[in-house]
């Protein structure tokens, strides 16, 4: 526990000690405060009915200055291992340009939503460790993905019943935005895990 507290303190000190240049960041990633969002969908449907080209449609609600606003989004489960292993798989969020216009999501057509793997209470701690790794990397490298913490009020649809969950997660910006910011390009390339050092 002491190690976690020390790591959090070091991260907070480094975040507030170094001024970050937010030029090129979308509005969503210019703030450090956790974004409160609400999502409602069937986890079972997400796992079984979505793939690289098939999405489910829903609304993402977010709090902006005390007022809840809605954005139409399309969602799909990501990843093979987590999709088969986790209760909540990571989610790819697609937002139409017209739906994102004038919202905190403007400029973000595609985001990754990282969620805890399991429903156990301490799993929120694990997701926060992963988030801290992203934030630490922002401090030590000029080439990084921006991440924004989210507090999620998730309503899981289970047939005719609904179950509410309070979970923590974070959003990661799309690789196309990162490539544009650093004047690079995204290269889709499969590298077998055994070929890596």
Kindly label every feature range from the protein language model.
Residues 1-21:
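Bacterial Sec-dependent N-terminal signal peptides
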Residues 20-197:
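Phosphate/dinucleotide-binding and metal-coordinating scaffold of catalytic cores
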């Amino acid at each position: 526990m002491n190690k976690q507290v020390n790591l959090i303190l070091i991260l907070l000190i480094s975040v507030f000690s170094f001024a970050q240049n937010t030029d090129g960041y979308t509005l969503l990633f210019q703030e450090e405060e956790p974004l409160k969002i609400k999502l409602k969908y069937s986890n079972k449907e997400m796992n079984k009915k979505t793939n690289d080209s098939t999405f489910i449609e829903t609304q993402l609600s977010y709090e902006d200055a005390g007022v809840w606003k809605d954005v139409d989004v399309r969602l799909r489960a990501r990843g093979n291992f987590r999709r088969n292993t986790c209760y909540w798989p990571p989610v790819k969020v697609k937002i139409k340009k017209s739906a994102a216009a004038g919202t905190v999501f403007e400029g973000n057509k595609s985001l990754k939503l990282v969620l805890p793997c399991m429903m156990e209470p301490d799993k929120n701690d694990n997701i926060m460790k992963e988030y801290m790794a992203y934030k630490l990397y922002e401090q030590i490298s000029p080439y990084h993905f921006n991440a924004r913490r989210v507090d999620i009020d998730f309503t899981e649809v289970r047939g005719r019943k609904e179950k509410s969950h309070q979970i923590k997660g974070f959003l990661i910006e799309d690789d196309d935005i990162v490539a544009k910011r650093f004047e690079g390009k995204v290269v889709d390339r499969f590298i077998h895990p055994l070929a890596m050092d």
